[in-house]
């Protein structure tokens, strides 16, 4: 079984948290709301990976003013690829508390939508298991 280390930013701006809705046809959690993030590449430092993933998935304009390592989690997930293939992967999630100076987001093709969500509204979103676990641990659910 392949192992992946995933960096996940829990991004907050003015009391709201950034959630991204995964594309319906790919990823570990198709069609569900999640934190952004992605895999650490060989030879890449963890914070470099976090900043790269944010640029790739959320655009160059989102400005982070704080990045603080917070916690980790792990599980086994089945990833569905755009061509229909599936693969089981052991996922290690490194989760960071982040604060952004703005809400300028430009999502890439991995996502179909995004939202800045106040804690009291999080229960109304179809959150994936990993995101739900993270938000509970943070005391937001």
UniProtKB/Swiss-Prot annotation:
Name of the encoding gene: nudI
UniProt keyword Magnesium, yes or no: yes
Hydrolase recorded as keyword: yes
Organism: Escherichia coli O1:K1 / APEC
InterPro entries, per the entry: Nucleoside_triphosphatase_NudI, Nudix_hydrolase, NUDIX_hydrolase-like_dom_sf, NUDIX_hydrolase_CS, NUDIX_hydrolase_dom
Classification lineage: Bacteria, Pseudomonadati, Pseudomonadota, Gammaproteobacteria, Enterobacterales
A molecular function GO annotation: magnesium ion binding
Domain Nudix hydrolase: 1-141
Motif Nudix box: where in chain: 38-59
Annotated EC: 3.6.1.9, 3.6.1.12, 3.6.1.-, 3.6.1.23
Coiled coil: none
Protein name: Nucleoside triphosphatase NudI
Taxonomic superkingdom: Bacteria
Quaternary structure annotation from Swiss-Prot or TrEMBL: Monomer.
């Amino acid at each position: 079984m392949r192992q992946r280390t995933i960096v996940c930013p829990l991004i907050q701006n003015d009391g709201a948290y950034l959630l991204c809705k995964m594309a319906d046809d790919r990823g570990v959690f198709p069609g569900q709301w999640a934190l952004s993030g992605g895999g650490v590449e060989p030879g890449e430092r963890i914070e470099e990976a976090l900043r790269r993933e944010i640029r790739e998935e959320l655009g160059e304009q989102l400005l982070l003013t704080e990045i603080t390592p917070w916690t980790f989690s792990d599980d086994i997930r089945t990833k569905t690829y755009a061509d229909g293939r599936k693969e089981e992967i052991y996922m290690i999630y490194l989760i960071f508390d982040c604060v952004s100076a703005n809400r300028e987001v430009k999502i890439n093709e991995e996502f179909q939508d995004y939202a800045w969500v106040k804690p009291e509204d999080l229960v109304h979103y179809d959150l994936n298991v990993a995101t739900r676990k993270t938000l509970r641990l943070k005391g937001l659910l």
